[in-house]
Amino acid sequence: VKDFAPISLLAVVPNVLVVNAAKNPDKSVKEVIAHAKKEPGKLTYASAGNGTSIHLAGEVFASMAGVNILHIPYKGSGPAITDMLGGQVDLMFDSITSARPHIQSGKLRALGVTTAKRSGALPDVPTIAEAGVPGYEVSPWFAVFAPAGTPPEVVAKLNKVLNDAMKEPDTLKKLE
């Protein structure tokens, strides 16, 4: 990459596979896979839009699990969650941040996180790899970049400041 100078990786934030707890009987990733194989092309999954990490998480899942599920793109996570809660879609890959309140309320059931390791935000939820799709990992990340040609001493200073901030207990707590 010639246009940017990397400064710091800030966070890797898992996405989560959820179903509507009242309307979808699937209680595990393996059950979703069996359901999708029994009815190819019938199960739908919502995402925050085409090309988002959430969309890609669903496509990687479908490919690795060997299932045909229909992607329903929305204009953001909010409308997708609204339809997920209303039962208009069968599955959803979403950010933990958006989905967690609905998981905690019992309206959504979390089946797996997309990263290689479990999330501190949902420690009882297995990874999708653990839950039935070996090798599955989609790890969205957030980073800071500067324009190419930024003086190295500025990049180094920003790197230090950001890395120090990311170690602060308050920052770590907010990222859970």
Where are these regions (language model features)?
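Hinge/capping helix and adjacent helix->loop/strand transition within the periplasmic-binding protein
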Residues: 1-79, 128-130, 141-174
